């Protein structure tokens, strides 16, 4: 058996480099070096911290290693000597995203992305020490990759998700690195590499995008035949290697434009690295590192790891089984040195695993338990779902019994030949179970530890003939702290000794006494040890007298426990004085350290792993551990399922899949026949929904309820949104207005209307300021001491002012206070002008609103008069006997509801959808709901009801004998004289009344015409006034606009500085971009010029070689032949000159002519040599010309960039001059010479005809004032320079404080990282779920469940409370009745005692004793009855309190306070 330890797996693909024939991979805190088939481990640093990234420079022989601590340190080694040269601390805060050397090894670049993206550059100085030369911040964009250009180290490309940033001038000591940003259009980049033609970027769907560095544009370069993303790129010579997300590796020949598929790996390609052999390439995928031969497309595994983190390590027979988080299994056989990876495609995550007999049992977070055999092939023997809750831990007796637990339930499962069968379960736990361990006393007992520190001893009773298996709780103990892991050491009938890794980071030994009375006081440990700095994670038994433990510090400790394997006397907690037997530092600190450990063999060997894919295999537990091994042979193994053991033999799963399928098919056939028969019988009456299954019907009902609930919820939120919008409008646009919006509409034309002006509510503070400004301005005008430019300007006419203000309204009190436009050139004056203009605008608006209100009141009065006239017309028409009025009689003015300002928040029936209005008219109870508009119309109609108007008509009663409708009717020929006389009088009276009625009707019709005319006249008058008011409003609006423009002009003085500053900053920003572009072009120009000069030198060398070759040919055959040499030389010279002119061809050996054949062949060889040399020169000349064209192209771009930069510099200078002219208020100063006579108004007058004479003394005074102003300017300029210097000092102080802030933020992030790390460790140790979304879903489900349960409990509590109240009332009545009986009995006893004493019969001792005994018996019975009733009351009260506490926990607090 090999005694050397070995390591499986590696940290990440970023911790991979190829150094000559060696492959270096970071594994934990060390580096695995593979050379050919042998591997070894090298600990470059302390080994306590993980290796992050590796970078190697073959030219300089430097190896850079990052060590991830609380911050990141960079170590520099000389390799392969492994000599430590340098350590640079704090190169990154969390981790290094990418680290890369330039092609010449002179520059190292580090990319960090947390807290912000930063690229740091180090140059290799003398002595091969790295010196930081530059650092560039890229902001908050997450970058992925770095790449240097070929044969250059002064620039680098940084890959972003949607673009590329190019940093230039990294090696310049004068300039800081300049950044050029190039964004893509519709591409998401995953990888990049700098090649010969430019920057290649890998995008989605197999696309490779080429970035042209000169033109700064992108174009599609290659389209690979794959739908996956391009995740890795590498150029090696003329081949471009392309790695994809699906594991395909393509090659693309840049010269031939040919693409081919090299190999399919099946795993996502992460990195591609070059090797010393140009025919090989190193491919790093997510799970392995492979060397691929380009010619043969054969692959050789360099190193491999599992696809996910390690959860459990098992030793089954001679195999080491690695159980991964995703369910995959990795087996390692030491005898054959082979490792097999078996992917298990289950959607669950693995929680724990253990060995039962010859099978491995794995538990999942979905509640499933599966058993596997791993001897020859990995196969699933059995599976079953134990619980709906996620499982947390498992343990076994190693033979046939398995115990698993979810949150609060422990399940016992019997295992027979790998078949799983549920035996029993126990749910007596109040808290979550975290750890399970099998007892050591040989019985079927399990110790279960909870997260509150309790340890329960569960005994599995087994099956019998009459009953099923059961679980009993023998004993419960409470420890002082919860445990991370524990291990039973010794057990008998009295005590159980356990070894514990506690959460307080101590290792302890407890004695669990079986006879101990249950107390609330926790147990105290017997011995305390501090084996692990960060606390222990796992414990295992190592032989009979020792244990092996591992912790978060990455150490494995072996300790002797022989003195714990007995019953110990009770002792106070003491510190263990014995030191561990062995200590091994195997894994780095962080990420939980060692989380899984298993004993390998009887020689003290063990295997351990953590929350990654690195596994240490130590065959012999001796110190020190020597790591040297041959890499195992990896093979992929497929999982198989045993047909007879694919399911568990429980109640519903005992039938095989084939039998179930046959039964279902037969049942479906019978059901199909019954359905066809039923359809034939009841086709007309059967509905389609009758065939729905109950589950489908229930699902449909649930969907309907969900849609109804969603609709109601949407309606509710829309109503809430509408209310919020109305509230916002009312509070921010209505309540703040002193005068709300309103309008007046013409009586005849609805399009003619006039609006008022909105006015906000006055502010008291603003009114005070306005009052003070007016007073100050009035005092300023009165004193006339202020200088004004307007006084220097001559006006054509003093009274030629804008007269629109006079026609718009009365003059304002601020008209005389306003500044002239020319005088508003300082900040204070602009402020005063703004306030005065605001007062002026407010005055104009108020003046117009007064006229508006006057017209509105008048219109209201006229509308009332028109309504009265219309009413009079209606009554007149009724008197005239017409029931309906003609349209031309009644005047109907135009009505607009918006004339009332309050209607803005009212909704009328005309604004509602008629369909919705029909639904809203009737309420649910069938009563008619009258809308407000209908109610107002009804009120108006009722108010208009009056007495019936008498109609004007002839009202003369006809005599009865003349009415043919009566019985007294007498025909005219039969009437008497008297009747004839009466009828004549009747006719006469009818004629008179007819004339009178006609006259009244004519008068009424004239009155109607007058009323109609009056209505039209008043309406026309109102309309004319509205037109006039509209004109006035237009003038006022124009005046307000003009005043607001003056406000804008005054406000521009305040905004001028900011505007000029923004303009200046924009120009500077564009200038910086152009400068970065120019520096990048300079770098590109130098690189291409260097290539051109090298190519030109190669051309000259080839020309010299050709000349030397021709010269040397003269001394070689055939030109040395004495007969033909001179002739052939002349012929060769002639041929060469003609061939250069294109007039001759290469001679053929078969056409020798008279020349001897051997000499002619030699002559032809010389010609071919010349042709080959000439072709080589032409080819090199073409390359040189192409490079020259590229240089010229770069020069052209540089000129364009330089011209643009010059333009930006001119724009910058213009901005500076604009600042001097506009911001500093500079005016031209005119110096008057001594004795000069000049008019100071001449420069602003139309001509020089008007001037004034000045004395010489006045001129002298003016000059003195000018010189004094120069002195003042000098003082101001010095003061401004001092202020500028102080501003620079403040800027420097600000930068220093910002640096201090950055330092403090960095320390805060480090502390936060430490806290998050510790929280992650606690989370991993406690087994809590780390998915926030899952926790939120669980909490939501928990809330809903608690809500439903609590509602049921509330209802139950109310029923119980009412029942208890009734019982209490009954008990009270019963107690009152019993008290009355007791009182009556007491009185009777007292009376009998008195009578007895009077009679003297109590002297009989026998009777007295008998009565005394009976009295004592009665008293005891009554006392017992009272005690029972009191206990009953107390029990009922406690029941009420318990129900309250269970239903609402806050009631429990109130109950306690009340009890106190």
Swiss-Prot record:
| Gene Ontology annotations of biological process type | axoneme assembly; cilium assembly; cilium-dependent cell motility; spermatogenesis
GO cellular component terms? Answer: axoneme; cytoplasm; motile cilium
Residue stretches of each WD repeat: 46-87, 91-132, 184-221, 303-342, 428-468, 529-569, 589-628, 911-951, 1129-1170
Highest taxon above the source species = Eukaryota
Short name of any one Pfam family annotated for the protein: CFAP43_N
Spell out the subcellular localization from the entry.
Cell projection, Cilium, Flagellum; Cytoplasm, Cytoskeleton, Flagellum axoneme
Residue stretches in coiled coil = 1170-1214, 1399-1446
Keywords, A to Z, come to: Cell projection, Cilium, Coiled coil, Cytoplasm, Cytoskeleton, Flagellum, Repeat, WD repeat
Entry's Gene3D superfamilies?
Answer: YVTN repeat-like/Quinoprotein amine dehydrogenase
Q: Which residues cross the membrane?
A: none
Q: Which family does it belong to?
A: Belongs to the CFAP43 family.
PANTHER family, from UniProt? CILIA- AND FLAGELLA-ASSOCIATED PROTEIN 43 (PTHR14885:SF1), CILIA- AND FLAGELLA-ASSOCIATED PROTEIN 43-RELATED (PTHR14885)
What does this gene product do? Answer: Flagellar protein involved in flagellum axoneme organization and function.
What is this protein called in UniProt? Cilia- and flagella-associated protein 43
What species does this protein belong to?
Trypanosoma brucei brucei (strain 927/4 GUTat10.1)
The uppermost taxa in this organism's lineage are: Eukaryota, Discoba, Euglenozoa, Kinetoplastea, Metakinetoplastina
């Amino acid at each position: 058996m090999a005694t050397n330890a070995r390591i499986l797996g590696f940290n990440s693909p970023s911790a991979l480099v190829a150094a000559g024939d060696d492959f270096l991979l970071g594994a934990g805190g060390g580096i695995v070096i593979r050379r050919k088939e042998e591997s070894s481990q090298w600990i470059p640093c302390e080994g306590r911290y993980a290796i992050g990234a590796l970078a190697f420079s073959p030219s300089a022989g430097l190896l850079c290693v990052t060590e991830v601590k609380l911050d990141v340190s960079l170590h520099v080694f000389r390799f392969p000597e492994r000599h430590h040269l340098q350590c640079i601390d704090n190169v990154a805060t969390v981790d290094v995203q990418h680290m890369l050397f330039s092609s010449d090894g002179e520059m190292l670049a580090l990319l960090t992305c947390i807290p912000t993206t930063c690229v740091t550059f180090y140059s290799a100085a003398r002595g091969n020490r790295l010196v930081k030369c530059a650092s560039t911040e890229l902001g908050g964009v997450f970058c992925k990759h770095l790449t240097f250009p070929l044969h250059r180290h002064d620039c680098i490309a940084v890959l972003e998700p949607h673009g590329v940033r190019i940093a230039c001038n990294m090696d310049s000591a004068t300039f800081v690195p300049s950044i050029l940003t190039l964004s893509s259009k519709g591409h998401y980049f995953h990888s990049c590499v700098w090649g010969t033609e430019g920057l290649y970027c890998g995008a989605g769907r197999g696309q490779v995008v080429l970035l042209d560095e000169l033109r700064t544009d992108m174009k599609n370069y290659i389209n690979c035949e794959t739908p996956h993303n391009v995740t890795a790129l590498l150029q090696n010579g003329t081949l471009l290697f392309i790695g994809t997300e699906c594991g395909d590796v393509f090659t693309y020949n840049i010269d031939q434009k040919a693409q081919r598929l090299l190999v399919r790996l099946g795993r996502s390609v992460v990195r591609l690295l070059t090797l010393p052999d140009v025919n090989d390439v190193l491919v790093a995928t997510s799970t392995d590192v492979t060397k691929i031969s380009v010619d043969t497309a054969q692959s050789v595994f360099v190193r491999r790891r599992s696809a996910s983190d390690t959860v459990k390590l098992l030793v089954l027979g001679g195999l080491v089984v690695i159980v991964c988080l995703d369910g995959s299994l990795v087996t390692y056989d030491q005898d054959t040195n082979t490792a097999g990876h078996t992917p298990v495609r289950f959607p669950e995550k693995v929680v724990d695993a253990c060995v039962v007999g010859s099978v491995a049992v794995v538990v999942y977070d979905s509640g499933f338990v599966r058993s596997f055999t791993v001897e020859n092939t990995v196969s699933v023997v059995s599976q079953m779902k134990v619980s709906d809750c996620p499982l947390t831990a498992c343990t076994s007796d190693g033979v046939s019994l398995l115990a698993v637990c979810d949150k609060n339930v422990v399940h016992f499962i019997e295992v027979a030949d790998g078949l799983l069968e549920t035996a029993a379960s126990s749910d007596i736990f109040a808290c979550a179970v975290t750890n399970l361990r099998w007892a050591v006393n040989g019985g079927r007992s399990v110790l279960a530890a909870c997260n509150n520190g309790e340890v329960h001893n569960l005994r599995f009773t087994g099956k019998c003939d009459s009953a099923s298996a059961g679980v009993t709780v023998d004993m419960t103990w409470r420890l002082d702290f919860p445990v991370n892991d524990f291990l039973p050491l010794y057990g008998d009938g009295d005590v159980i000794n356990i070894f514990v890794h506690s959460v307080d980071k101590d290792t302890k030994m407890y004695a669990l006494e079986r006879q101990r009375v249950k107390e609330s006081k926790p147990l105290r440990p017997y011995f305390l040890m501090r084996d692990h700095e960060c606390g222990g994670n796992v414990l295992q038994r190592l032989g009979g007298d020792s244990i092996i433990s591992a912790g978060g510090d990455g150490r494995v400790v072996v300790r002797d426990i022989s003195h714990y394997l007995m019953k110990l006397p009770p002792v106070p907690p003491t510190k263990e004085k014995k030191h561990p037997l062995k200590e091994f530092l195997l894994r780095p600190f962080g990420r939980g350290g060692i989380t899984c450990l298993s004993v390998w063999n009887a020689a003290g060997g063990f295997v351990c792993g953590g929350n990654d894919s690195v596994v240490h295999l130590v065959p012999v537990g001796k110190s020190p551990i020597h790591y040297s091994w041959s890499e195992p042979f990896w093979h992929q193994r497929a999982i198989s399922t045993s047909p007879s053991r694919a399911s568990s033999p429980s109640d519903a799963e005992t039938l095989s899949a084939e039998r179930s399928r046959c039964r279902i098919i037969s049942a479906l056939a019978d059901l199909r026949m019954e359905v066809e028969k039923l359809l034939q019988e009841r086709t007309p009456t059967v509905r389609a929904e009758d065939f729905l299954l109950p589950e489908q019907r229930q699902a449909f009902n649930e969907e309907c309820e969900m849609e109804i609930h969603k609709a109601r919820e949407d309606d509710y939120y829309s109503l809430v949104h509408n209310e919020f919008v109305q509230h916002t409008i009312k509070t921010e646009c209505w309540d703040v207005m002193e005068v709300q919006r309103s309008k007046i509409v013409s009586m005849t034309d609805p399009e003619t209307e006039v609006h008022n002006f909105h006015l906000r509510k006055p502010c008291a503070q603003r009114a005070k300021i306005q009052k003070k400004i007016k007073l100050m301005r009035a005092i300023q005008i009165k004193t006339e001491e202020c200088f004004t430019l307007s006084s220097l300007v001559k006006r054509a006419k003093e009274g030629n002012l804008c007269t629109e203000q006079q026609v718009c309204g009365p003059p304002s009190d601020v008209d005389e206070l306003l500044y002239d436009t020319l005088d508003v050139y300082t900040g204070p004056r602009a402020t005063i002008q703004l306030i005065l203009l605001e007062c002026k605008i407010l005055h104009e608006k108020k003046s117009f609103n007064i006229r508006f209100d006057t017209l509105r009141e008048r219109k209201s009065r006229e509308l009332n008069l028109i309504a009265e006239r219309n009413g009079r017309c209606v009554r007149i028409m009724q008197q005239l006997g017409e029931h309906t009025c003609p349209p031309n009689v009644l005047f109907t003015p135009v009505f607009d509801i918006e004339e009332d300002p309050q209607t803005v928040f009212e909704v009328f029936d005309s604004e509602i959808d008629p369909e919705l209005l029909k639904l809203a008219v009737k309420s649910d109870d069938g009563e008619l709901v009258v809308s407000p508009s209908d109610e107002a119309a009804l009120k108006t109609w009722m108010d208009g009801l009056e007495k019936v108007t008498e109609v004007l008509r002839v009202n003369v009663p006809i005599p009865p004998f003349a009415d043919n409708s009566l019985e007294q009717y007498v025909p005219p020929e039969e009437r008497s004289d008297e009747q004839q006389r009466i009828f004549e009088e009747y006719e006469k009276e009818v004629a008179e009344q007819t004339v009178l009625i006609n006259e009244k009707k004519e008068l009424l019709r004239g009155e109607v015409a007058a009323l109609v005319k009056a209505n039209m006249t008043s309406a026309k008058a109102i309309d004319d006034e509205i037109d006039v008011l509209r004109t006035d409003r237009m003038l006022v609006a124009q005046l307000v606009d003009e005043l607001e423009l003056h406000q804008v002009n005054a406000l521009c003085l305040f905004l001028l500085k900011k505007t000029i500053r923004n303009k200046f900053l924009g120009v500077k920003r564009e200038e910086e971009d152009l400068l970065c572009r120019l520096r990048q072009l300079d770098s590109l120009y130098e690189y291409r010029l260097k290539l051109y000069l090298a190519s030109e030198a190669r051309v000259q060398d080839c020309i010299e070689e050709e000349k030397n070759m021709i010269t040397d040919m003269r001394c070689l055959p055939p030109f040395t032949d004495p007969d033909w040499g001179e002739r052939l030389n002349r012929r060769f010279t002639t041929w060469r000159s003609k061939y250069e002119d294109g007039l001759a061809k290469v001679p053929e050996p078969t056409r020798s002519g008279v020349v001897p054949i051997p000499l002619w062949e030699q002559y032809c060889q010389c010609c071919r040599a010349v042709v080959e040399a000439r072709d080589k020169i032409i080819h090199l000349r073409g390359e040189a010309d192409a490079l020259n064209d590229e240089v010229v192209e770069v020069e052209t771009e540089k000129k364009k960039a330089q011209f643009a930069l010059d333009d930006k510099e001119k724009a910058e200078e213009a901005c500076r001059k604009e600042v001097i002219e506009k911001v500093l208020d500079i005016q031209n100063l005119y110096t008057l010479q001594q004795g000069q006579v000049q008019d100071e108004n001449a420069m602003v007058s139309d001509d020089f005809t008007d001037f004034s004479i000045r004395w010489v003394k006045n001129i002298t005074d003016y000059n003195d004032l000018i010189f004094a102003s120069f002195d003042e300017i000098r003082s101001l300029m010095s003061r401004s320079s001092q202020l500028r210097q102080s501003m620079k000092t403040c800027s420097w102080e600000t930068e220093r404080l910002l640096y201090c802030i950055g330092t403090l933020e960095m320390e805060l992030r480090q502390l936060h990282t430490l806290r998050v790390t510790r929280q992650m460790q606690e989370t991993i140790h406690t087994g809590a779920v780390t998915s926030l979304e899952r926790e939120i879903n669980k909490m939501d489900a928990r809330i809903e469940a608690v809500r439903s349960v609590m509602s049921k409990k509330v209802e139950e509590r109310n029923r119980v409370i009412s029942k208890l109240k009734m019982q209490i009332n009954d008990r009270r009545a019963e107690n009152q009745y019993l008290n009355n009986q007791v009182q009556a009995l007491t009185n009777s006893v007292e009376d009998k005692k008195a009578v007895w004493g009077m009679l003297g019969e109590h002297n009989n001792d026998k009777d007295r004793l008998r009565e005394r005994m009976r009295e004592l018996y009665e008293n005891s019975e009554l006392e017992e009855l009272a005690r029972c009733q009191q206990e009953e009351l107390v029990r009922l009260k406690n029941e009420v309190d318990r129900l309250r506490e269970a239903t609402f926990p806050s009631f429990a607090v109130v109950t306690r306070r009340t009890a106190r």
